[in-house]
């Protein structure tokens, strides 16, 4: 086991604080509408330029191991805020730095660290409750656009695009961010259910100009197995041919004789048919086939429960108004499924989202909800260079998370004003003893830090503006972008309540633990063992 280095008390806390400040100082320059960019060197390719707090935090690794422990703990604050709300990472870092700095001063002055932490926790619980009181629902498109604009560093076009996307696919719809082809940002909306499986044979294509298969008013056969024997499908094919409608087959796979026969029938015009593989794998594939069945009012042929493909009739098939199949995707538009049954299916999937602990599963389940409930919107980010593209994509992604958080829990006045108002409301809060009272004051003083940092980044005097905002009431605050005072909500400066709440909770949680630190242990650096000495001239080894 490697030897360890141990530091105690003030010596340990000073080192830890140095690490906290190095990381937080690098992150906090990005806060607010006039926050600056940070350039991150990469081992290959061009450097990355970002204004995203968590991206900056993740890059920082310090040589001094004790300092690094402090930095890593604050990095955890930014990561947690990012996971919970997708935004507010810089605010969380600024709050954590303020609480740690103020708290460690109190510890150095002889206060009990455990009581300080209890006081901080008490203040944060009260502050979260007060934030919920101040919160207003984010109901209309205008408010959604404003939240997106603020989060995307005052880029109004991004805010409007996100609001438009939410309007088109609904609050539960999936909105993804991709690289665009040109210089402008674009919004593409996919109506209906789309999954990433294309046609199994190019001979199914009936629209050569677009390279797609289009089926109008088709039947849909869903099969949870590989189909290779055409005899199994003959009853269904005959029924569809008599009805004079096209057919889409969605199966685990269609191969060999079955695929060849379908292609021949299509080319001869006997029956208009197309086949695609079912989306997903394993249990997820079965679940998605059931989703398609719900959407199209059809059934899935599942051999596990004794159903046979030969016995399938037209009543077992789903219906939709239109289906478009490209090389990569299949889109089912206007399935004829019962709205009440679809809604109950969505509720069931939402319950699974609540219960799952896996981020990957949660993401896949949310995609399924979106496909059933609304649709999919794609924001294509345009930029002149790859470096700008990466930076812009990160901002759009942050803005998207912020707007989702705003829809979920509402909005409060932005620009750090909400926390200042909460701190003023809690001025009379008291703990069980004097040390807890100091902890409460530490937390309340830290709540001013985001406002002060926004003002500092705008090149103004923090104390003057912080006092002016504190003397105001309600949503009165300072717009660092226009350098004017006024009603923050009226000026469109909004923060999602969830983002502000998460930032405060995670910052206080980790900062509270750091204040109560008394000892730090790390591995000593290994001493390099010297190389073997030169053997020199050995006796009797001379040349003859």
UniProtKB/Swiss-Prot annotation:
It catalyses: ATP + H2O + a folded polypeptide = ADP + phosphate + an unfolded polypeptide. One of its GO terms (biological process) is protein refolding. Pfam families: Cpn60_TCP1. The keyword Chaperone applies. The keyword Mitochondrion does not apply. Its EC number is 5.6.1.7. It is an enzyme of class 5 (isomerase). Keywords: ATP-binding, Chaperone, Cytoplasm, Isomerase, Nucleotide-binding. InterPro entries: Chaperonin_Cpn60_CS, Cpn60/GroEL, Cpn60/GroEL/TCP-1, GroEL-like_apical_dom_sf, GROEL-like_equatorial_sf, TCP-1-like_intermed_sf. GO terms for molecular function: ATP binding; ATP-dependent protein folding chaperone; isomerase activity; unfolded protein binding. GO terms for cellular component: cytoplasm. ATP binds at residues 30-33, 51, 87-91, 415, 495. It is found in: Cytoplasm. SUPFAM superfamilies: GroEL apical domain-like, GroEL equatorial domain-like, GroEL-intermediate domain like. Belongs to the chaperonin (HSP60) family. HAMAP family: CH60 (MF_00600). Together with its co-chaperonin GroES, plays an essential role in assisting protein folding. The GroEL-GroES system forms a nano-cage that allows encapsulation of the non-native substrate proteins and provides a physical environment optimized to promote and accelerate protein folding. Forms a cylinder of 14 subunits composed of two heptameric rings stacked back-to-back. Interacts with the co-chaperonin GroES. This is Chaperonin GroEL.
């Amino acid at each position: 086991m490697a030897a360890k280095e141990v530091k105690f008390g003030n010596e340990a806390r000073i080192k830890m604080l140095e690490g906290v400040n190095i990381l937080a100082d690098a992150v906090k320059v990005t806060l607010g509408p006039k926050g600056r960019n940070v350039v991150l060197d990469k081992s290959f390719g061009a450097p990355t330029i970002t204004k995203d707090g968590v991206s900056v935090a993740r890059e920082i690794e310090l040589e001094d191991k004790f300092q690094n422990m402090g930095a890593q703990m604050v990095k955890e604050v930014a990561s947690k805020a990012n996971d919970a709300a997708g935004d507010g990472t810089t605010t969380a870092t600024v709050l954590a730095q303020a609480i740690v700095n103020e708290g460690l001063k109190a510890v150095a002055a002889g206060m009990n660290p455990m009581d300080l932490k209890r006081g901080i926790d008490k203040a944060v619980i009260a502050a979260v409750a007060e934030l919920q009181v101040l919160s207003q629902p984010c109901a209309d498109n205008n408010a959604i656009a404003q939240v997106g604009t603020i989060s995307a560093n005052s880029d109004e076009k991004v805010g409007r695009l996100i609001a438009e996307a939410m309007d088109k696919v609904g609050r539960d719809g999936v909105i993804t961010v991709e690289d665009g082809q040109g210089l402008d940002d674009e919004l593409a909306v996919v109506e209906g259910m789309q999954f990433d499986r294309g046609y199994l044979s190019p001979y199914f294509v009936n629209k050569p100009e677009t390279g797609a298969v289009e089926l109008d008013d088709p039947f849909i056969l869903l099969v949870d197995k590989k189909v290779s024997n055409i005899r199994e499908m003959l009853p269904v094919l005959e029924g569809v041919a008599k009805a004079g409608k096209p057919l889409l087959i969605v199966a685990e796979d269609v191969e060999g004789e079955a695929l060849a026969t379908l292609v021949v029938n299509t080319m001869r015009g006997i029956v208009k048919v197309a086949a695609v593989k079912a989306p997903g794998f394993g249990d997820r594939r079965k679940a998605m086939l059931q989703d398609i069945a719900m959407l199209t009012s059809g059934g899935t042929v599942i051999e596990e429960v004794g159903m046979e493909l030969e016995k399938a009739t037209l009543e077992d098939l789903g219906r939709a108004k239109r289906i478009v199949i490209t090389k990569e995707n299949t889109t089912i538009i206007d399935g004829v499924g019962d709205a009440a049954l679809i809604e109950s299916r969505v509720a069931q999937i939402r319950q699974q989202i609540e219960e799952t602990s896996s981020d990957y599963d949660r993401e896949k389940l949310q995609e399924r909800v979106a496909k059933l409930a609304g649709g999919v919107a794609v924001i294509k980010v345009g930029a002149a260079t790859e470096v700008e593209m990466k930076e812009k994509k990160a901002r759009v992604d942050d803005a998207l998370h912020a707007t989702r958080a705003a829809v979920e829990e509402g909005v409060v006045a932005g620009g750090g004003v909400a926390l200042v108002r909460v701190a003023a409301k809690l001025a009379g809060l008291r703990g069980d003893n004097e040390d807890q009272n100091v902890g409460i004051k530490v937390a309340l003083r830290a709540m001013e830090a985001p406002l002060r940092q926004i003002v500092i980044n705008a090149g103004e005097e923090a104390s003057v503006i912080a006092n002016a905002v504190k003397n105001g009431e309600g949503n009165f605050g300072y717009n660092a972008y226009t350098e004017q005072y006024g009603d923050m909500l009226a000026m469109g400066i909004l923060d999602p309540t969830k983002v502000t709440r998460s930032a405060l909770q995670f910052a206080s949680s980790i900062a509270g633990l750091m204040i109560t630190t008394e000892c730090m242990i790390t591995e000593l650096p290994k001493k390099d063992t010297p190389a073997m000495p030169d053997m020199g001239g050995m006796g009797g080894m001379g040349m003859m």
